[in-house]
């Protein structure tokens, strides 16, 4: 992880047969998160990015959390920070996509500082499982993405 935030870090890796471009679209399009994730409510983009609709500055809401894109380098790197809705003072996640032959390695890393003293170990366990689930689910979905998925819309980057 290039830029570390907080004393705790977590990470997960998954491999998919989908290309890095396909995976990147599923990461940056907020509405696509509802296609591959298991969230209590629909994900949506609240605000477009400064130079690209889903780029740096874009704000995504996956209630109760709100996140802002801080790094956008298609199709290799994507990073975001939590703005609200999580029991964390600071949270930054970075996703790196590495093409390897006919596959793409998804490396999802996060760093955080707990909001409440004594909760760091429990939050690390939770976030480690969450990122592992995210990496596996997006990898699986990208190999089987159906028409109608928001990540398949033209000109989304």
What residue spans do the PLM features occupy?
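Acidic pyrophosphate-coordinating catalytic loop
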Residues: 49-53, 88
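A conserved amphipathic terminal alpha-helix motif
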Residues: 111-157
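Hydrophobic-ligand binding "helix-grip"
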Residues: 34-35, 61-105, 111-113, 132, ...
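Juxtamembrane/interface motifs at transmembrane-helix termini
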Residues: 42-46, 55, 126-128
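Hydrophobic ligand-binding cavity/cleft-lining segments
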Residues: 1-50, 155-157
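Short coil-to-beta transition motif at edge beta-strands of beta-rich domains
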Residues: 53-60
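A structural signal for short, well-ordered beta-strand segments
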Residues: 10-16, 95, 108-110
């Amino acid at each position: 992880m290039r830029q570390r935030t907080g004393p705790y870090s977590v990470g997960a890796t998954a491999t998919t047969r989908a290309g890095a471009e396909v995976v990147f679209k599923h990461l940056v399009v907020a509405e696509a998160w509802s296609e591959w994730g298991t969230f209590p409510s629909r994900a949506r983009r609240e605000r477009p990015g400064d130079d690209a609709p889903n780029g740096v500055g874009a704000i995504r809401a996956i209630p109760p959390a709100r996140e802002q894109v801080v790094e956008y380098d298609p199709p290799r790197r994507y990073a975001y920070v939590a703005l609200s809705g999580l029991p964390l003072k600071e949270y930054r996640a970075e996703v790196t996509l590495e093409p390897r032959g006919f596959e793409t390695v998804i490396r999802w890393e996060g760093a955080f500082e707990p909001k409440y003293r004594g909760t760091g170990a429990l939050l690390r366990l939770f976030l480690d499982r969450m990122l592992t689930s995210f990496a596996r689910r997006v990898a699986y979905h990208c190999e089987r993405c159906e028409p109608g998925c928001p990540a398949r819309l033209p000109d989304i980057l």
